[in-house]
Amino acid sequence: MGPDEIEMVPPKTPRGLPPSETDYQPVNWKRLFLRPKYLAMWVVLVIIIILTAIITIYHDKVVEVGDIRHFDNVCGGKQEILTAHPLQHLRPFAEQVRHLPGGWLIPIVILIVISFPPLFGHEIIALLCGVVYGLWIGFGIVAAGTFLGEVGTWFAFKYLFRQKSEKLERTSLSYGALARITRDGGFWIVLIIRFSAIPTHFSTAVFSTCGVNFWIFAIATFLTLPKQIFLVYLGVLLLQDKPDDAPKNIVFGIAFVLTIVMAGYIGFKMRFVKKILIEEQEERRKALAMPTMDDTVNTGDGVLDTERSEYEALSQNDFSIAMPGPAAGNHTPLGEPSKGPSTAPSGWTTEAVNTPDSPGTPPNEYFGQQPAKGFQWV
């Protein structure tokens, strides 16, 4: 299998929608934010975003060991008071885990668990692994936990939430666009999406339900694991007595530029595909709305297809063939007055022959036409 080939598995049809039917609707933000059943979800989401931002910005404070100093007024003067921050206990706890038999399995298990949405905290575990285990051992632990967690998420969405995901592909424009890009782009698009800033929970759900072969997904996930070394290296930098901000800023800059460039490329393709999906949906709906024209299609000369077919069939069954007879000269078809000399050969006569289907009545009289004439042997 080439790098651009992805083995696609035909998806099952979700209940309630035909295989090719979609229902892409513009997002009603007012309804989405203000409906009572969504309020609790938005509150939880805001809390998660705030905690994630705090952890990302103050990650060095979370894992460093030392007292936090602040000043308080005592008897009109200033006195320095040493207080312990609760997050300072993370590194000592990680050091204790390191000395446990098989303690390195604990961060792997934690990374697997938090790989399932909506859990978070991957950055903190990666930083602690860099602080406690160093660069390469820490990277190996983080890579193993991340890979196994993504594989678990892939199987969970494929077999437990498949129907929901397939319905989402037909109702969510962003989800459907990413699925279309994945199917059309092949292995390299899967790899770029894994490298980009698109949340892995979202992309893994798309990959698991849009027909991407598991081994293609596994290879792309494995090749993008070096992204994790940036977080582990930041943890290593925190151990320096006099940390230099330059390496840390360079690491952050490289990671930021790579992920944003990849995400921008995927976003550009998604905007283009969204227009195509909307156009295809409109064409399908117009086709379904048009009445059936099988019995009313005009052929261009004023005769309908069905009427023309009847006319031709009946005309072929009603014919007159010249028959040789004793008289020569003027010959007229049966039941029709003579209008002039016959064109039949000398010694022939003409006679109308009716079909068994309509004896006695020329079928073409139904259409107000003269019956077809021919020749018949006597």
Swiss-Prot record:
Main location class: Golgi
InterPro entries in alphabetical order: Golgi_membrane_TVP38/TMEM64 (IPR051076), VTT_dom (IPR032816)
Function: Golgi membrane protein involved in vesicular trafficking and spindle migration.
Record topology, Lumenal segments: 1-37, 121-123, 235-249
Record comment regarding domains: The VTT domain was previously called the SNARE-assoc domain. As there is no evidence that this domain associates with SNARE proteins, it was renamed as VMP1, TMEM41, and TVP38 (VTT) domain.
Keyword tags: Golgi apparatus, Membrane, Transmembrane, Transmembrane helix
Gene designation: TVP38
Segments for region (VTT domain): 130-238
Localization annotation: Golgi apparatus membrane
Organism: Podospora anserina (strain S / ATCC MYA-4624 / DSM 980 / FGSC 10383) (Pleurage anserina)
Protein name stated in the entry: Golgi apparatus membrane protein TVP38
Topological domain ranges for the Cytoplasmic compartment: 59-99, 145-213, 271-378
GO CC terms in record: Golgi membrane
Family to which the UniProt record says this protein belongs: Belongs to the TVP38/TMEM64 family.
Region (Disordered): 1-20, 322-378
Bias-annotated ranges (Polar residues): 340-358
Membrane topology type: Multi-pass membrane protein
Transmembrane feature ranges: 38-58, 100-120, 124-144, 214-234, 250-270
